[in-house]
Amino acid sequence: MNRIGIVILLFFSCALHAQEINEPKGKNMDAILLVTFGTSDPEAKKAFANIDKLAREKFPGYEIRWAYTSEMIRKKLARKGEILLSPEEAFAKLKTDGFRNVYAQSLHIIPGEEFHQLVTVCAVFKKDFEKLTVSPPLLNSMDDVKKSVGIMLSKVPADRRKEDAVLFMGHGSGKHPSDMIYVAAAREIEKSDVNAFMATVDGNPTFDEALAILKEKKVRKAYLLPFMSVAGEHAKNDLAGDGADSWKSILSKNGIESVPVLKGMAEYDDIAQIWLEHLEKTIKQ
């Protein structure tokens, strides 16, 4: 090859290398943003690690990122040197990194206030991407409710006797209309198992209602399971804590032995797949 040919070859080689360096990271990739309320509990984070692993397996070739909707948890983690982005910050970063198609997946349980705030944020950033979608949370239909209830009842330890009760703790959504989804889930639970019940921390059905039923049935033992994505502070303190106001303590005062099963819903592959099925449906649309 003559000297001119070598120079031309080197020129194009350098130009190609420069293009690769300056190429926006996301130009040839789509991104998935997994959005959750968040947790600061190291043990509870196992649930997020599990759904992250399953998402990467189900959607190879997609960039997987996370956002926490809870400012309180983000600040708490930041004090420990762990930086988590809000949905707004995450979308801005995805834009800066050059991603064109972004699929946000809500990891909330119901389409409550947190979910609708996410929808609002997505609407603001929609103009910044060729495609920006948000997929619904776990319980988005009665089919989702029935499937989730069936799976969670199957997670009760096998040594449970038929006279033992099962009590699920949901978060609840206060006065938000979507709180009725917990009521629907509670009815589905009771239809499936006469000694299984749902109560919420902040909404309906209430713990007092569930306690009254357990006392009426003269239950002596109850398995306690969080109906939440992670087994975080609510599960460890409000459900199974040693404090006087925990469900475990109140049940004990009423002669009911508690068996806590502290595992977040996102730790179960079959539950996690419901979220990912919502995401897959959106991506294929």
Task: List where the protein language model places each region.
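Sec-dependent signal peptide recognition
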Residues: 2-8
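Hydrophobic h-region of N-terminal signal peptides that target proteins for export
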Residues: 9-17
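Active-site-proximal alpha-helix that buttresses catalytic centers in soluble enzyme cores
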Residues: 19-285
